[in-house]
Curated annotation (Swiss-Prot):
Organism listed in the record: Neisseria meningitidis serogroup B (strain ATCC BAA-335 / MC58)
Record bears the keyword rRNA processing: no
Keywords recorded for this protein, A-Z: Ion transport, NAD, Sodium, Sodium transport, Translocase, Transport, Ubiquinone
Protein's UniProt name: Na(+)-translocating NADH-quinone reductase subunit A
Catalysed reactions listed for this entry: a ubiquinone + n Na(+)(in) + NADH + H(+) = a ubiquinol + n Na(+)(out) + NAD(+)
Coiled coil: none
Pfam families reported for this sequence: NQRA_2nd, NQRA_N, NQRA_SLBB
Taxonomy, superkingdom: Bacteria
Gene name for this UniProt entry: nqrA
Subunit-level organization: Composed of six subunits; NqrA, NqrB, NqrC, NqrD, NqrE and NqrF.
Amino acid sequence: MIKIKKGLNLPIAGRPEQAVYDGPAITEVALLGEEYAGMRPSMKVKEGDAVKKGQVLFEDKKNPGVVFTAPASGKIAAIHRGEKRVLQSVVIAVEGNDEIEFERYAPEALANLSGEEVRRNLIQSGLWTALRTRPFSKIPAVDAEPFAIFVNAMDTNPLAADPTVIIKEAAEDFKRGLLVLSRLTERKIHVCKAAGADVPSENAANIETHEFGGPHPAGLSGTHIHFIEPVGANKTVWTINYQDVITIGRLFATGRLNTERVIALGGSQVNKPRLLRTVLGAKVSQITAGELVDTDNRVISGSVLNGAITQGAHDYLGRYHNQISVIEEGRSKELFGWVAPQPDKYSITRTTLGHFLKNKLFKFNTAVNGGDRAMVPIGTYERVMPLDILPTLLLRDLIVGDTDSAQALGCLELDEEDLALCSFVCPGKYEYGPLLRKVLETIEKEG
């Protein structure tokens, strides 16, 4: 077992009950274009078109052959675009059960599939988009080969679902999905799980299981990659989430694209935090209807540390998100708040009484408690960064855009989620995720 000591388990109220309930009926789903780094769509549908589940909606011009398919049947209700015509979302009004059928295989045939058969079925169904590269966190080219594939079967994000609960319901599909991935490449398939977690595996020669323990970010793929198979400019691995492995197993067994998602609905503003069964790209406001405390709330697709605000054209469950988090908007200001003992506020430093209340869960809000200021290196980054890098120096380089130094310090190993805790504890109120993405784009473009 690999056990990390540095990190932070956020003591946030509203942890979900680890039992799966059926979610509300969903009448709108969408694909969010801005989730896919560097993607430039070539649209295959227009508003008003009828589509089947599994039908191609658009293709990536920059990554030919990579297609994005409909998560449900219905009609194209809207195609939202932002500045410079950036694709924001393709919205489908759900109607009927029409679907496209893909190749299916008998269970005993899965172990003999060729890599080309696996690749073709994943690409045609749109499940190729479940894979992401590291470095750069982009969808791999259809003819690319990884050094390894990392299956993330754990989650240490605040308010997250316990993957073992979800995998237990679909253990055979998960095992079939692992077997399919083992046929995609001859390289290692690293299945990463929490210490002592009951996660099934397959006996394929290239599948290895690893256990991780410790606080968040022990459950992030970036942490797993760093300790098992570090990447660099000339070494790429792929990552995939456990729920997508289940979906792949179902696709190859049935020939049908199953877009079911089990998500955690949690946070201090949720009346009954629990796990809900819904669909990929579901309209978030329909999921949360009647579920929230009647105040000014911020609804987030994903983790409170690194999720996306859901509103307007973005009011949909993200492709790579397994949770919806809800916290209160922090719009009020406090007079001389820094003088008060503040037992109801959490701080990683010893600046509030709440820091010393070890077993208390706090009702967090969106207030940042101060304005923008200079980056202050007081050791907080080092306390939450378990990777063997120099976080203060790296974060400084991200701020000034020094790509050469950032690359030398290990930025190619990282994704936005890997720096979310650094943003949370930053006295200067910097958001390091967008800064990292900007530097990665520059490195990819200019070298």
